[in-house]
Amino acid sequence: MSFRMVSRQQQLRWLQEGRGQGQLDTYKPFLNVRDNKSLTERSSRVYGYKTQRTHHLFSDLELALFLALDRIQDIEDIREQIPLDLETTVQIAEDLKIPHPIEKNVHQILTSTFFIVNHSPLKPPCFVVKALKSIHLDQKRTIAQLELERRYWEQKNIPWFLFTEKDISSTAIDNIKWLYPLNKVNNDIYTFSKMDFYQNYFLQKPELTLIELSKYLDTHYSMEAGASLLEIRELLAQRYFLFDITKGYRKICGRDIEIGNIQHLEKLRNVSGE
């Protein structure tokens, strides 16, 4: 992934703004999707139920990993695009005699994809994950940057992991592609009425797949073919309903659907006036 060059003045301004600092809903990612329009991969902004804020993700791989992490009960906080201290990474590069990322004589601040906090007694209290497509692992420059990042977190005694598309099922990626086109803020005043409607049928007919249920509803209510499936997709994409992202959407049944974070949904309900 390639970002535009960031001047030292801009780096300092972003840090002074509190980017890369905070926790849960107060955390501000060091980089966000508005900062850079030159990304070669699809970026997205998605609401996190654990953090109660919008997350900035720069690829389908990051999105798939985030959705998986956000479902893990033991995880308390997920912070994306977290900056590494520049002086420390420059020193590590000098010690290892490897190049540090630099553009127009300006050292660039490295970032880790996710900093994760969890409360499981069987796991470390926090760990870091770098999400990267495996095709980039053939590039010497990328390998050098990954080693800088790994050494940085090693010095802090924080586990660091590399995550590629080979570590996630193609099914999860297919689900992301199915949902992504509808992953936009929905101001439909009937959203909660739709939720109640479909939740009722998920409970009534738990054995039907979403596609089977949608066909039934389209026929029963004389709706246009595919209309109910589109509405269900919208509710899933916007996370009003949740399901296991590793299970193919064609096999998802009503019993597999969960309602999104209740507190967040109540806030939306109050705002919408329903």
Model-based region annotation:
Residues M1-E274:
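Electrostatic, structured charged patches in enzyme active sites and in nucleic-acid/phosphate-binding
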